[in-house]
């Protein structure tokens, strides 16, 4: 009795420490959500203001969706985004695999531009420890055509807060071409989502061990047959898919965690239930 009390107390102590650690993780203040990347050298002309907002991360189709806004003028309250362009301008944007041009004519309203950036490295199969890397290169030219235009310096602001994701951004500007900026996005799942997904997979593994243990002990006659255990194991069969549906981020079925844990946990519970039913059918538990 004393040993069980000590073990139970240690278990509650570990649970309390884990609760405190998660609490500290929740109230932790991270880096600023808005990052500003200004030209490294003093621009010879007026810089083009670019505001990039991360709208979503789609790990299934390997893409990061952005919304770009541009401003060339300033009102008394601040920058005037989606205002009229003060000159003919062409903005080149590319992610290393594809490139597109955004063209504005003098006086044309610069509306928001949606953009999808391909993920260069990362695989959703590694869920919940999947990490992704993507790059976005931008350059602006003060002309209706790139070939005849003079490069315009860029002052880029990025809003990186996105629920369920932890995003880091860095910028590089080649010394030979200071008007070109390359943004590198590092994306991974939020710490709490990783913890929650890992906990669910651990719960599946524990349920599998319980099911195999109960079924084996009943079948071997170590424990007396109890039909209540059959009901519990039958409930586990349907509980496991429900737990899988609670995975944060809705990962596609078949990720590595499913192959290593969920699939075998479901089979283990079914085997445990089959052993229990077989024990009841042959009446071994009543001997």
Predicted regions span which residues?
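Short, charge-rich amphipathic segments
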Residues: 3-5, 66, 166-173, 192-195
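Hydrophobic alpha-helical transmembrane segments
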Residues: 143-150, 173-183, 200-218
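Membrane-helix boundary elements
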Residues: 1, 22-27, 179-197
């Amino acid at each position: 009795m004393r040993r069980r009390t000590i073990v139970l107390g240690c278990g509650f102590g570990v649970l309390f420490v884990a609760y405190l650690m998660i609490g500290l993780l929740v109230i932790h203040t991270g880096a600023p959500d808005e990052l500003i990347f200004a030209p490294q050298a003093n621009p010879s002309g007026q810089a083009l203001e670019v505001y990039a907002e991360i709208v979503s991360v789609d790990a299934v189709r390997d893409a990061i969706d952005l919304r770009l806004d541009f401003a060339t003028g300033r009102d008394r309250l601040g920058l005037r985004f989606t205002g009229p362009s003060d000159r003919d301008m062409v903005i080149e944007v590319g992610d290393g695999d594809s490139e597109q041009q955004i063209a504005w004519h003098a006086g044309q309203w610069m509306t928001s531009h949606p953009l999808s950036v391909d993920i260069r490295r990362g695989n959703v199969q590694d869920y919940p420890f999947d990490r992704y890397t993507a790059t976005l290169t931008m350059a602006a030219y003060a002309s209706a055509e790139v070939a005849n235009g003079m490069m315009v310096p860029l002052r880029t602001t990025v809003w990186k807060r996105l629920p369920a994701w932890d995003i880091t951004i860095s910028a590089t500007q080649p010394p030979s071409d200071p008007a070109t900026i390359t943004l590198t996005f590092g994306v991974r799942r939020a710490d709490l989502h990783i913890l929650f997904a890992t906990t669910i997979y651990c719960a599946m593994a524990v349920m599998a061990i319980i099911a195999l243990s109960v079924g084996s002990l009943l079948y071997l006659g170590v424990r007396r047959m109890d039909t209540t255990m059959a009901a519990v194991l039958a409930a586990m069969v349907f509980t496991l898919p429900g737990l899988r549906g609670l995975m944060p981020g809705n990962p596609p079925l078949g990720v590595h965690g499913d192959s290593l844990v969920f699939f075998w946990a479901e089979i283990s519970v079914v085997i445990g239930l089959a052993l229990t039913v077989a024990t009841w059918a042959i009446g071994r538990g009543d001997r």
